[in-house]
Amino acid sequence: VFAARLLDTSVTQFSSQVGDARTHATDPGVARAVALLRAQEQIVFDPADGSRLTWDNAGTTARGRSGRPVFPRIDPAVIGLIQNSDGSQILLAEHARRSGFFSCVAGYVEAGECVEDAWRREVWEETGRRVYDIVYVGSQPWPTTGALMLGFTSRTDDVEQVGETDGELVHTRWVQRDQLSSLPLAREGSL
């Protein structure tokens, strides 16, 4: 962990040449190092007794006076493709906080919610569309935010928005695969 911090300091000096954690998000070693460093910076006190935590040498477990293990926080999130009913188009979103780029719909899983229901809810809240044929396709750690992204595909019969949205998106757009290269997409490693 100490070596990773030294490396992080060096990388900051040369970030335009080597990128940042998002650039290397698919590298498991980078994802793990970023997640563990993030945990040590953000989880400082024992939730059981308020004492300062001491992390083990691997940076994977901390303990305070209570002796109970404290682990890095991982926030489950859903992300995925929404296809029209015949699968010929996908729905992309332009987020209000990152206008000018298109990406997939995504959001966090709420307490007590299964991931499939989280996907349905996020699509409904952000796009005002109902989805079905929800299929889990894989996961990826998202160390810069502490998330574990759970990827899905789904279909909708709702070509147009049928419900109110939460305002997170500027707008949505149906596209065919051959149109993707002409769109301003979010860079790899970002939403």
Role assignments for model-derived ranges:
Residues 1-43, 55, 99-102, 149, ...:
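Nudix hydrolase/Nudix homology domain
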